């Protein structure tokens, strides 16, 4: 080939790549500006009056708030930390710290597994971003609290207690949900901070048992696996928030994708990366055209059913992470498509609407009639995380 033609192709390729980067930057910048407007409004409402409140969703024209011990309580503080990371505006860090420290008592909570979400997304981000020394002890105490839920005979962290609420009606003994993969990160970090390998060993045991028992041959994940806590025997495989026991609940697949990629990052164990990539292939093969999944991949009324923006946001963040690990371009392309769709008027709220939340059209738990087709604080959290991960890619 003529040298001049080769040089021409190289120049064109470089220009196209540069334009793509500029387009990427514009998408991030546009979303940050939108988030600034929305979250400023939501922040003001959360701090109105004498009581600091934790916004979770917006329904029937009203923002709804949750108590500190709700599983979603850490996401708003984490969202504020992400806004600081995206803007370098100290105002966001100041408010993030206030909302984080409201959750101080959660480090002692032992009656469910979601303390990883609650504390690591708040105190964990604060420690990572601002290196606030006292946050280290909060994380270690939380890791100890979470570790009390480890059932040695089964080798897993029990997700829910079964002595109260709707969980008591299911006949479970030691239910483990795929979501629990997301709570292992705080254990991995606790070992790094303390040198105590107990946390690491618990996290690996749980991940290995999940790898062994949660997945179907097509790499889709069950939502719930119930164990005998003494023997480790699998008693049931079923769902709580999906369409059916054998269906693929979208957010469950998102947790699996994200959780195993994260476990690989902390351990270097190839089996975790392989599982995350198997889940990735399953998801990519079943996504609708715009990349935003329906609430369950097997919902019987597709396409006339709800999308779940929260699942797309979690998946987008996880796909960027997988791309940074493997360099597989399909992962970046999938994440880019998801972010592009979530940034469109179909899913991103206009400034001044949606109660101050960024994204519309998420689904909490359709079987429970809870938070259907509404904004959710964790959708916004993972959306901003995906923007951060995208902005850091070369």
Feature map (PLM): residue ranges:
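Bacterial Sec-dependent N-terminal signal peptides
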Residues: 1-26
């Amino acid at each position: 080939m003529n040298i001049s033609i080769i040089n021409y192709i190289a120049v064109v390729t470089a220009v196209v790549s540069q334009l793509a980067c500029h387009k990427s930057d514009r998408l991030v910048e546009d979303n940050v500006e939108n988030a600034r407007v929305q979250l400023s409004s939501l922040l003001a409402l959360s701090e109105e009056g004498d009581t600091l409140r934790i916004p979770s969703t917006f329904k029937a024209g009203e923002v709804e708030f949750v108590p500190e011990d709700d599983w979603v309580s850490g996401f708003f503080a984490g969202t504020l930390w992400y806004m600081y990371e995206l803007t370098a505006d100290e105002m966001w860090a100041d408010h993030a710290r206030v909302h984080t420290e409201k959750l101080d008592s959660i480090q002692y909570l032992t009656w469910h597994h979601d303390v990883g979400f609650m504390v690591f997304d708040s105190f964990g981000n604060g420690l990572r971003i601002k290196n606030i020394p006292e946050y280290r002890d909060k994380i270690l105490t939380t890791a100890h609290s979470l570790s009390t839920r480890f059932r040695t005979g089964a080798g897993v962290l029990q997700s829910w207690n079964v002595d109260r609420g709707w969980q008591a009606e299911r006949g479970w003994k030691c239910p483990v949900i795929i979501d629990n993969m997301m709570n292992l990160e705080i254990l991995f970090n606790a070992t790094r901070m303390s040198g105590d390998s107990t946390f690491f060993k618990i996290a690996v045991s749980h991940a290995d048992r999940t790898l062994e028992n949660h997945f179907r041959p097509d790499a889709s994940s069950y939502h719930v696996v119930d164990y005998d806590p003494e023997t480790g025997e699998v008693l049931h495989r079923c769902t709580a928030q999906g369409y059916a026991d054998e269906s693929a609940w979208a957010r469950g697949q998102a947790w699996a994708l994200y959780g195993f990629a994260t476990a690989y990052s902390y351990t270097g164990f190839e089996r975790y990366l392989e599982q995350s990539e198997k889940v990735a292939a399953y998801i990519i093969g079943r996504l609708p055209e715009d990349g935003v999944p329906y609430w369950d991949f097997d919902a019987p009324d597709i396409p006339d059913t709800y999308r779940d923006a929260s699942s797309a946001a979690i998946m987008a963040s996880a796909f960027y992470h997988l791309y940074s690990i493997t360099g597989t371009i399909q992962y970046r392309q999938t994440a880019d498509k998801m972010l592009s769709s979530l940034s469109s008027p179909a899913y991103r709220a206009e400034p001044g609407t949606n109660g101050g939340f960024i994204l519309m059209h998420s689904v909490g738990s359709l079987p429970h009639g809870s938070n259907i087709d509404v904004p959710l604080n964790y959708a916004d959290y993972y959306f901003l995380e995906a923007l951060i991960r995208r902005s850091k890619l070369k």
